[in-house]
């Protein structure tokens, strides 16, 4: 009887390939239109918080419309209906209702029923707007994921109605707002309009009911949306906001956001709103400052302006807005505001004689002012880079670099005004109290222990010459040490870091495995010896987190297998020799992106191929610019902006905290510290449990 395997032709035989051929033709490719794609993958255009982002896009458009005095409007009315739908109405110009001779679409369908459409992509003056919606997709995406949307436009003495069913334009039967009413699709509907009793009426009203099947895991937080609308109104002089509750069926709406707003406008009243919403005290005395400058975008030098209100308060409260958008993730504008404000106040406090300092006591530092400050900042910056369509943070590093010194100059001038002397004194004394509390854990107590712990530090206490030091250091300073992969990565860190609090040291290749080594044997390894001298906190039983020169130690390695090996060796070293630092939450692994997907100034950072593919799809859907994919072969090849945004910026980077796990201690010892026989046994055991039948070994 012949062996069945002998009947299989060799791989080089033509029959081998013919028998394994799979039909794959153009018919196998599924093509989706914009509505289908958005309904299938809503997070691509609207982020993870799908429903809140979608409704905010509609509200942003309305407020932006009436914020321009040339548009003839002043009021936005938000109505919460009992059926769960929301209406957003403005008394601005009213969307165009005529028909585009090229596409056959009317102006409403072009604006709210078409992705990547809007006046901001044209030569129209709206193209240089600092409004919230600049991607040309958000409001349309909101319509796409709705069960029904009715758009009513009043202009030219008439009222026009355009409906959308499940994202497509057309006509519903009946006069009630019923998403289940019979619907006829019509992409090229010509709007006739009916005469208004009041011919002077003008504006746009959008009533939208989201389709619950599209984003079942997303919930609409109407209180947060209304809070953002109130904030945007306060930053838009002349804009009035009215909220009407007709029996909202969701969670109870906070009464404060149901109140109408008719001024005053500015960051002063904005700070009141945000402190009240956060339940934190309102500062009784305040600094109100503003400024302007230029930062770098894809258009070249681009003007921006900012304004902020801040005052002494505990606990600290910060509220950051850019182009009227609330950015809970902060970003460049918030970093610049806090840095400029706190540094200017700290410099002023350093020259005060009546602060009440003890002999040889240092005054409060910038971080101490930041800890006792309530602040609201509003920045207007055309072409600003957002972290995503959800716009939770600003990622334009050049804005930070240009804005921080301008804030510092303005605050310095304000603080030098004799009329503000009492406010500066109060602020400085509150910051001094914060400084004393901060230093209590690191001052005399830490120094008193240093002598008894010194025997654990070795004899060579000089710092390695390749260490890139930070100006700040010591426990409680906020200083960070990056252990990076090689000199090339060090060069990138040097160009991108904030030298005030970020230090770096390059590792020569993979650090040695010193797990379980006697201390004298470990110190014979150059990398171990250098790290011990840099940290200055002792090792093993003598390791004291309070003596460490840095509050955080971060491993920065390439996003490849070699980088993973380096991180593994460092984690092993720290679990053995610096376990108290790990237990104190001071040790982290950075997650640099493997890919950067770009379209103009917008960038999305991706950890793997699946994130890359999703980002490419998102940018192609939201931008008419060419999409580029950059693969980062190593940290040294990243540009400074990307490195800052993804590895260095404390507000935007992704890091993983190293945590001790007692349940894995035995396995860790086997893999890193035990005899080779244990590792061979472990690998054989794992291999025996692999289902080889699922592997293609041909």
Swiss-Prot record:
Residues 479-593 form the Toprim domain. SUPFAM superfamilies: ATPase domain of HSP90 chaperone/DNA topoisomerase II/histidine kinase (SSF55874), Ribosomal protein S5 domain 2-like (SSF54211), Type II DNA topoisomerase (SSF56719). Maximal DNA relaxation at 5.0 mM MgCl(2). Inhibited by quinolone antibiotic ciprofloxacin and coumarin antibiotic novobiocin, but at much higher concentrations than is usual for DNA gyrase/topoisomerase. The keyword Nucleotide-binding applies. Keywords: ATP-binding, Isomerase, Isopeptide bond, Nucleotide-binding, Topoisomerase, Ubl conjugation. There is a cross-link at residue 429 (Isoglutamyl lysine isopeptide (Lys-Gln) (interchain with Q-Cter in protein Pup)). It comes from the Bacteria. GO terms for biological process: DNA topological change. It catalyses: ATP-dependent breakage, passage and rejoining of double-stranded DNA. The keyword Membrane does not apply. Belongs to the type II topoisomerase family. Catalyzes the relaxation of negatively supercoiled DNA in the presence of ATP or dATP but not other nucleotides. Individual subunits have no activity. Not able to negatively supercoil DNA, it can however introduce positive supercoils in DNA. Relaxes positive supercoils in an ATP-dependent manner. Catenates and decatenates DNA. Generates dsDNA breaks in the presence of the quinolone antibiotic ciprofloxacin, showing it is a topoisomerase. A complex of TopoN and TopoM, possibly a heterotetramer. This is Topoisomerase subunit TopoN. The lineage of its organism: Bacteria, Bacillati, Actinomycetota, Actinomycetes, Mycobacteriales.
């Amino acid at each position: 009887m012949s062996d069945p395997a002998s009947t299989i032709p060799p791989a080089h035989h033509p029959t081998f390939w013919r028998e394994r051929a799979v039909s794959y033709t153009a018919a196998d490719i599924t093509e989706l239109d914009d509505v289908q794609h958005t309904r299938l993958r809503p997070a691509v255009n609207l982020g993870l918080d799908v429903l809140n982002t979608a409704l905010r896009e509609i509200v942003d458009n309305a407020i932006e419309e009436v914020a321009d005095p040339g548009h003839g409007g002043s009021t936005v009315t938000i109505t919460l209906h009992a059926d769960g739908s929301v209406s957003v109405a403005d008394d601005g110009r009213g969307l165009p209702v005529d028909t585009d001779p090229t596409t056959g679409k009317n102006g409403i369908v072009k604006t709210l029923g078409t992705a990547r459409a809007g006046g901001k992509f044209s030569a129209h003056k709206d193209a240089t707007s600092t409004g919230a919606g600049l991607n040309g997709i958000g409001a349309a995406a909101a319509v796409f994921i709705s069960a029904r949307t009715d758009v009513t436009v009043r202009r030219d003495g008439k009222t026009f109605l355009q409906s959308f069913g499940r994202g497509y334009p057309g006509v519903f039967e009946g006069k009630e707002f019923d998403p289940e009413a019979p619907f006829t699709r019509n992409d090229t509907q010509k709007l006739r309009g009916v005469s208004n009793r009041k011919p002077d009426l003008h504006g746009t009203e959008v009533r939208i009911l989201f389709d619950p099947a599209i984003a079942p895991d997303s919930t609409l937080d109407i209180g947060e949306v209304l809070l953002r609308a109130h904030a945007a109104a306060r930053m838009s002089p002349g804009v009035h906001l009215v909220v009407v509750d007709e029996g909202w069926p969701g969670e109870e709406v906070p009464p404060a956001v149901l109140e109408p707003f008719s001024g005053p406008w500015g960051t002063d009243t904005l700070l009141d709103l945000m402190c009240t919403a956060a339940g934190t005290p309102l500062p009784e005395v305040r600094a109100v400052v503003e400024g302007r400058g230029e930062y770098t975008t894809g258009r070249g030098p681009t003007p921006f302006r900012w304004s902020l209100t801040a005052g002494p308060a505990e606990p600290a409260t910060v509220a950051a807005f850019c182009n009227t958008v609330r950015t809970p993730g902060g970003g460049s504008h918030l970093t610049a505001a806090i840095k400029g404000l706190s540094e200017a106040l700290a410099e002023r406090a350093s020259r005060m004689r009546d602060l009440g300092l003890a002999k040889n006591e240092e005054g409060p530092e910038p971080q101490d002012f930041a800890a006792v400050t309530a602040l609201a900042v509003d920045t207007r910056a055309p072409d600003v880079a957002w972290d995503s369509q959800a716009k939770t943070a600003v990622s334009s590093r050049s804005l930070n670099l240009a804005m921080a010194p301008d804030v510092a100059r303005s605050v310095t001038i304000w603080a030098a005004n004799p009329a503000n002397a009492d406010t500066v004194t109060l602020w400085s004394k509150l910051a001094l109290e914060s400084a004393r509390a901060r230093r209590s854990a690191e001052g005399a107590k830490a120094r008193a222990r240093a002598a008894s712990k010194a025997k654990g530090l070795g004899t060579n206490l000089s710092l390695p010459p390749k260490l890139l030091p930070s100006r700040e250091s010591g426990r409680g300073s906020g200083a960070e040490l990056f252990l990076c992969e090689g000199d090339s990565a060090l060069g990138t860190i040097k160009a991108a870091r904030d030298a005030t609090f970020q230090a770096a040291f390059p590792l020569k290749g993979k650090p040695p495995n010193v797990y379980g080594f006697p201390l004298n044997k470990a110190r014979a390894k150059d990398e171990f010896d250098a790290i011990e001298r840099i940290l200055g906190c002792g090792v093993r039983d003598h390791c004291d987190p309070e003596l460490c020169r840095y509050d955080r130690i971060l491993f920065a390695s390439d996003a490849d297998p070699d980088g993973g090996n380096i991180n593994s060796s460092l984690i092993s070293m720290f679990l053995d020799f610096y376990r108290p630092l790990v237990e104190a939450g001071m040790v982290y692994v950075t997650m640099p992106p493997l890919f950067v997907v770009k379209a103009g100034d917008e960038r999305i950072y991706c950890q793997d191929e699946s994130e890359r593919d999703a980002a490419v799809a998102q940018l192609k859907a939201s931008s008419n610019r060419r999409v580029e994919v950059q693969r980062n072969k190593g940290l040294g090849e990243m540009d400074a902006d990307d490195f800052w945004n993804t590895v260095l910026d404390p507000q935007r980077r992704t890091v993983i905290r190293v945590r001790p796990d007692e349940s894995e201690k035995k396995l860790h010892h086997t893999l890193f510290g035990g005899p080779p026989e244990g590792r061979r046994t472990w690998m054989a055991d794992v291999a025996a449990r692999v289902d080889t039948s699922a592997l293609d070994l041909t």
